[in-house]
């Protein structure tokens, strides 16, 4: 999966322009405020850093981790261009090698769906270890219905003047790739 995102890094946000990042970021900001979260956050599977940047602009101290080095390069470049300070690290969600703890951990865009089943328990243990006592774990995941009924054995395409994107998925007994 990392290799696919490596190749998408320059086009990721462009191809996801239908995702309302500002509204979704506002949803996170409202939720974090309502839950009384502290100001130090970790985003797992941060990709190009859209949520890290939005939360940093709102005064949060953000760290983003992702497996894809090119996506992290893009994230760091966009953060610099937007004048926000975010730390980015290449890391596997099942490892999360940093020792510090965070007030909250975000994992939007169903990033935990991309973790192989045998690594998922370690990923959740690492997420818990990275949270301060009482910290907030906020993740979304795709349902079995979506994966089996909408994504599996399907093709997705986006043809634009600058780029054409084709993705194929296959259903396996324990996962969709």
Language-model segment annotations:
Residues 1-36, 38-45:
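Conserved class I S-adenosyl-L-methionine
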Residues 50-95:
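Class I SAM-dependent methyltransferase SAM/SAH-binding core
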Residues 97-104:
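A short acidic, Gly/Pro-enriched loop at the edge of an enzyme's catalytic core
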Residues 108-109:
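Residues lining the SAM
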Residues 113-114:
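A short His-aromatic
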Residues 118, 138-177:
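SAM-dependent methyltransferase
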Residues 121-133:
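A short glycine-rich, Lys/Arg-flanked "PGG" loop and its adjoining helix->strand segment in the class I
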């Amino acid at each position: 999966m990392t290799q696919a995102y490596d190749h998408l890094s320059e086009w990721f946000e462009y191809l996801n322009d239908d995702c309302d990042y500002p509204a979704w970021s506002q949803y996170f900001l409202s939720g974090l405020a309502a839950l009384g979260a502290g100001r130090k956050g970790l985003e797992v599977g941060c990709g190009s850093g859209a949520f890290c940047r939005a939360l940093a602009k709102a005064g949060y101290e953000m760290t983003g981790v992702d497996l894809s080095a090119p996506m992290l390069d893009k994230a760091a470049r966009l953060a610099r261009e937007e004048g926000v300070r975010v730390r980015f690290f290449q890391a596997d969600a099942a490892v999360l090698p940093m020792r510090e703890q965070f007030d909250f951990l975000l994992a939007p865009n169903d990033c935990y769906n991309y973790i192989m089943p045998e690594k998922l328990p370690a990923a959740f243990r690492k997420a818990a270890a990275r949270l301060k006592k009482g910290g907030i774990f906020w993740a979304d995941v795709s349902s079995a219905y979506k994966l089996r009924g909408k994504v599996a054995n399907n093709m997705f395409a986006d043809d634009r003047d600058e780029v054409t994107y084709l993705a194929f998925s296959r259903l396996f007994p324990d996962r969709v790739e």
